[in-house]
Amino acid sequence: MDWECATPGEVFAQLESELAPRGYIADGWLDAVRTREDAYPTGLAMPAANIAIPHTDPGFVAKPYIAVVKPSAPVTFNAMAGMGAPVPAQIVINLGIAEPGGQVEALQALMNIFMDADAAADVLGQTTCQGMVDAIRRHF
């Protein structure tokens, strides 16, 4: 919560420092997530909130996870599939999906949360990490 990150690269570096010691990611994850974000941007301007959903190939995921970052100020990500201007993401949700193709289902569920004004307000209004997790679970 409230990470001081100005760029996607800083978000990814902070994520690596949290995930690697806990055994969630494999060696090479940081380079892989940066490379994938450059090639396939993940910023989404949703009706209820701006989000980014970066992820990498399952080979870099040691244990499945979903990491949620609420930066202290929005972090600008390029728009997914070239769909418009860069997106100042209020929430960054890093998907650590271990099975090929598993990202699609998770992406759809997360997008549904942030298309719903009440669900998005619930998630954005949380002030603790556990609160964020609980809010996402309520609407997932």
Stretch-by-stretch model annotation:
Residues 1-140:
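Cytosolic covalent-transfer regions centered on His/Cys nucleophiles
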